[in-house]
Amino acid sequence: MADYGAQLLWLRGEQDFLGNRYSRRHMLRFDGGVEIAASSSPHVVPVPMSDPAAVDPEEAFVAALASCHLLWFLSIAARRKFCVDSYADSPLGVMARNSEGKLAMTVVTLRPQVAFSGSRLPTPAEVVEMHHQAHAECFIANSVKTEVRCEPVFAAGTADSSTDD
């Protein structure tokens, strides 16, 4: 078992906190000193109280799911002796009312596009199976109620990449 943490810092400054006219911008700091500007989503709290250039919790949630999936996929591909050259994804999360009537991130769809090289290329079915296994192993996906879908995008670099699955 391991513990994971982060530091968050928000300062009011001279803002009108009691009038609900204050910036939601804050800093996230992670081990190693990486700092990320964070804010509420402009879809939730209007600009200028939100900073659209900063990462919002909803984006971070979607990115965490996609990142975890990526890391597991790479590990699985390496163990199966498939050489991955690149992995790109543009995951999309949908905020909607859940079965309890509460706003929640109800679906996150991953759309990974993976390029392989070498003499041993996976078939589309093997790629789909590796994504399925990556999802099953992902700690973040195993920690949430959100439906996580994976819709791989096939391009050059898979065996028989012209096959639709």
Predicted regions and their residues:
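Extended beta-strand/beta-hairpin segments
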Residues: 1-63, 71-165
